[in-house]
């Protein structure tokens, strides 16, 4: 629509066909399972859901597989994928080139205007956009609150007994931010109720969420969405997989059992498990 400066683009084929960058199968899987070309009749878009700053697209891709795993008698493999289309800030945050003496997460960039007759690569730091409310006080070295603090919500699926430990793990980062001049820079919140915000969703890129996933996986991860132009962290979804509890129960026994009677009991005290979770959440948030 030229009058409103909007354009309607049909991108269905990107998600329902074997498009580069949107497909599910790598060369190794193709070789191992003897995977053929995409079965377009059994590939489709499952769901599209939009929020103010992002659209989530879930789609299924199906392939014939002559050497599929033994439990698969249909000789096919289907994959369900999710892709996110995210609107970046209208004005990019000022980027910061990485100082390699400091351990930053970073994004690689390329300078094609270099006079070295080749492209030069460099890295920009991944960081939250924290701006002081009172710039003059901040310049004087006083602790000030940020205009927009970092807020992590807890997943509605998080068991009530673990929520205090998750919150403590998130807010353990208040101290380091105070060293940088910000107070209350990071806040942990319970998810809003349906009455408070009926549209709240962990998929909404406006919210950073610590997700509690019902899974047999023993792990936790801390992925984030970053603006590739500036390195600004737009949101983060820390993922805690339920069975990671067992991993830390085992580590607690092996690493402290010789000197710690609590670790040698059949049932580890709840507060001990909670403190382990707290430390993992703090690690992933960091």
Predicted features, each with a name:
Residues 162-169, 273, 277, 281:
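Stable alpha-helical elements in mature extracytoplasmic
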């Amino acid at each position: 629509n030229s009058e409103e400066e909007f354009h309607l683009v049909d991108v269905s084929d990107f998600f329902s066909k074997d498009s580069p960058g949107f497909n599910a199968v790598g060369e190794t899987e193709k070789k191992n399972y003897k995977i053929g070309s995409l079965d377009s009749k059994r590939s489709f878009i499952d769901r599209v859901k939009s929020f103010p700053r992002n659209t989530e697209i879930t789609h299924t891709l199906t392939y014939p597989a002559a050497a599929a795993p033994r439990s698969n008698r249909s000789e096919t493999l289907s994959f369900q994928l999710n892709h996110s289309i995210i609107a970046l800030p209208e004005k990019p945050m000022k980027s910061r080139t990485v100082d390699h003496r400091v351990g930053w997460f970073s994004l690689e960039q390329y300078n094609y205007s270099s006079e070295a007759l080749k492209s030069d690569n460099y890295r920009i730091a991944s960081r939250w956009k924290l701006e002081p409310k009172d710039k003059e006080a901040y310049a004087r070295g006083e602790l000030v609150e940020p205009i927009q603090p970092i807020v992590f919500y807890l997943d509605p699926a998080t068991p009530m007994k673990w929520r205090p430990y998750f919150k403590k793990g998130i807010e353990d980062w208040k101290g380091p931010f105070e060293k940088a001049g910000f107070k209350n820079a990071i806040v942990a919140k319970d998810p809003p109720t349906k009455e408070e915000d009926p549209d709240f969703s962990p998929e909404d890129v406006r919210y950073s969420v610590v997700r509690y996933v019902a899974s047999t996986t023993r792990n936790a991860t801390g992925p984030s969405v970053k603006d590739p132009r500036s390195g600004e962290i737009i949101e983060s979804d820390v993922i805690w997989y339920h069975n990671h509890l067992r991993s830390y129960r085992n580590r607690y026994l092996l690493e402290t059992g010789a000197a710690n009677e609590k670790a040698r009991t059949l049932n580890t005290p709840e507060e001990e498990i909670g403190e382990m979770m707290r430390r993992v959440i703090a690690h992933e948030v960091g």
